[in-house]
């Protein structure tokens, strides 16, 4: 009888011990980080499908060291420029070769989105395969050479009949926005194709090879604004920003410059109307509302996605981020995690009618084949 009682007591003690151990393990598990991803000693390759010096390159090189500080393990983030094909070359390479271990990311621009939206034959990538962790809206400024003799948008019509040259990455790149804008204003411009990025276009402008240009806000603020004081650039207009109702407003980063709809009214004497303007606005939204983004490749594990999302969120929520980013990116709200995913879903939603109209325009105007 005593033996039986002793066995019962021993069993009870064992069960109690096991329960306590399980509770301890559970406690430790709950106390552990949500994701155990650690990139200590690793090297992240950030593909930027544009040449050095343009808006996307400037944007990526600004973000890289800041995000690195917030990624588990603080890996070095190295920007790798792969220009070509209006950014399709680098995006195709990412789609084909990127590993899903969190060490390969892609930075896209509107010039990557437009060929995708238009069904460009060079596109072998699919945004639906990727996961966005950051969406950066931006603006853009159109400017001209002082040699053209105008001082503001009010004098734009005096450029009609003059030989205007614009260095372009391609008609299906983000350059679609300025090229269509000038066409709507009845201002003829010769597009010189073959640029590897907007940075190359800006350098062509600085060398005097072309006399009109546009840059996204990041490159404009950093690379072009200093030239205004030197008398080498005349700012004409910004593209503007969209308010909550989808109406164009002046870009708060360039409040003294009229936006495109204002310039339309200056030139045509009436408010914007017609299919061409509607299509311009649709592609402006697609190219600028979520203009640049950081993407992880297909098959990336959720814990790696979470680690990157958390790192980007910490970066943009830092106390000094707004001050630092205004000098490089302008004052635009950054969308992260789920908001970034939603931003790109909206930006890549173009109606079939708008797509068909612009494809026909590109074929007629620039002999683009689809």
Spans of features found by a protein language model:
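Bacterial N-terminal signal peptides
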Residues: 18-29
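Sec/Tat signal peptide C-region and signal peptidase I cleavage site
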Residues: 30-36
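N-terminal secretory signal peptides that target proteins for export/translocation
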Residues: 1-14
């Amino acid at each position: 009888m005593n033996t039986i009682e002793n066995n019962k007591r021993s069993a009870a003690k064992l069960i109690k011990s096991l329960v306590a151990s399980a509770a301890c393990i559970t406690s430790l598990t709950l106390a552990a980080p949500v994701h155990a991803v650690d990139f200590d000693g690793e090297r992240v390759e950030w593909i930027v499908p544009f040449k050095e010096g343009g808006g996307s390159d400037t944007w990526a090189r600004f973000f890289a060291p800041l995000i690195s500080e917030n990624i588990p393990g603080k890996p070095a983030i190295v920007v790798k420029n792969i220009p070509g094909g209006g950014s399709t070359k680098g995006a195709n390479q990412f789609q084909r070769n990127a590993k899903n271990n969190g060490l390969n990311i892609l930075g896209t621009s509107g010039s990557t989105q437009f060929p995708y939206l238009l069904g460009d034959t060079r596109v072998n990538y699919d945004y639906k395969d990727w996961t966005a962790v950051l969406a950066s809206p931006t603006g853009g400024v159109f400017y001209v050479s002082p040699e053209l003799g105008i001082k503001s948008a009010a004098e734009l019509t005096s450029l009609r009949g003059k030989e205007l040259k614009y260095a372009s990455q391609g008609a299906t790149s983000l350059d679609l926005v300025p090229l269509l804008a000038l066409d709507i204003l009845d201002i003829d411009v010769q597009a010189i194709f073959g640029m590897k990025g907007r940075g190359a276009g800006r350098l062509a402008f600085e060398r005097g090879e072309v006399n009109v240009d546009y840059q996204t806000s990041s490159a404009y603020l950093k690379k072009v604004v200093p030239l205004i004081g030197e008398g080498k650039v005349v700012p004409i207009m910004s593209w503007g920003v969209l308010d909550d109702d989808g109406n164009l407003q002046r870009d708060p980063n360039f409040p003294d410059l009229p936006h495109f709809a204002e310039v339309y009214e200056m030139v045509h004497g009436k408010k914007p109307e017609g299919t061409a303007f509607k299509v311009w606005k649709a592609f402006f939204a697609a190219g600028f509302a979520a203009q640049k983004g950081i993407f992880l490749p297909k098959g990336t594990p959720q814990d790696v996605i979470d680690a990157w999302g958390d790192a980007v969120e910490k970066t943009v929520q830092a106390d000094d981020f707004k001050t630092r980013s205004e000098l490089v990116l302008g004052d635009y709200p950054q969308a992260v995690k789920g908001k970034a995913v939603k931003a790109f879903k909206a930006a890549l939603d173009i109606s079939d009618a708008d797509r068909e109209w612009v494809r026909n325009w590109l074929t007629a105007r620039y002999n683009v084949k689809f």
